[in-house]
């Protein structure tokens, strides 16, 4: 029996296709589902999403304009590739994360409801299980949802967009390091501290936990 390769992008409905293609590609990049240097082929993305080439091309062109992707070379049919970051570029991005994410974390506590905190706690529990099972790709997805679940609560759209833009460029590099990456107790300690601070409504402790988490990456 032939092995069927599952698409990395979820199929979408037939409306607002340009926006949906853009969001789907961003989600895949944020979750580290592409690695640096990997080609993103228009036809393959369109097939995964169940849409035509035009909205996919437009979405990729926007990501290129935002410096998230590099334009594909001659003969790549309008596709793109994921940039290869050097250590200096990656360190710059991590410094930006350290500067921005604790601000969003501290602001999030005033808007955190019990329901929203329960969702974030669910992602934390998923991270623990996935780390033990070495399902690191799924771990990175849960890790992204944990962090952005917190930052979204700040209700500061410009700050949120700046953090997202940084993660869009970090995600693929983090994915590349997955085979050597083992999220252990030190990282769980920071995530647990962040979750506990969120439950307590302690913004300063939450900011400190997020800072420590990024610094230990």
Feature-to-residue mapping (PLM):
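Short amphipathic alpha-helical segments with heptad-repeat character
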Residues: 91-98, 178, 207, 211
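A ubiquitous short alpha-helical element
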Residues: 85-91, 105-112, 130-134, 155, ...
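Short linear motifs at protein or domain termini
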Residues: 1-106, 110
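A short secondary-structure junction motif
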Residues: 28, 32, 71, 166-173, ...
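Conserved amphipathic alpha-helical segments that form helical-bundle/coiled-coil interaction surfaces
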Residues: 114-175, 190-193, 205-216
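Short helix-capping and inter-helix turn/linker motifs at the boundaries of alpha-helical repeat units
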Residues: 16, 71, 117-118, 182-186
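C-terminal effector-binding regulatory domain of bacterial HTH transcription factors
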Residues: 1-12, 203-217
């Amino acid at each position: 029996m032939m092995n069927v390769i599952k698409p990395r992008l979820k199929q979408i409905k037939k409306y607002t296709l340009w926006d949906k293609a853009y969001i789907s590609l961003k989600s895949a990049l944020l979750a580290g589902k592409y690695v640096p240097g990997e080609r993103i082929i228009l036809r393959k993305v369109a097939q995964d999403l169940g849409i035509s080439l035009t909205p996919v091309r437009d979405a990729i062109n926007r990501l290129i304009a935002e410096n998230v992707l590099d334009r594909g070379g001659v003969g790549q049919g309008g596709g793109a590739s994921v940039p290869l970051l050097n250590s200096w570029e990656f360190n710059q991005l991590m410094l930006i994360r350290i500067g921005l994410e604790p601000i969003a974390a501290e602001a999030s506590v005033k808007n955190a409801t019990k329901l929203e905190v329960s969702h974030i706690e669910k992602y934390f529990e998923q991270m623990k299980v996935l780390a033990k099972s070495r399902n690191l790709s799924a771990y990175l997805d849960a890790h992204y949802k944990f962090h952005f679940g917190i930052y979204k609560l700040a209700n500061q759209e410009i700050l949120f967009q700046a953090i997202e833009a940084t993660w869009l460029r970090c995600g693929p590099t983090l994915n590349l390091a997955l085979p050597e990456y083992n999220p252990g107790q030190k990282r769980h300690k920071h995530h647990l501290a962040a979750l506990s601070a969120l439950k307590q409504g302690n913004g300063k402790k939450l900011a400190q936990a997020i800072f420590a988490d990024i610094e230990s990456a």
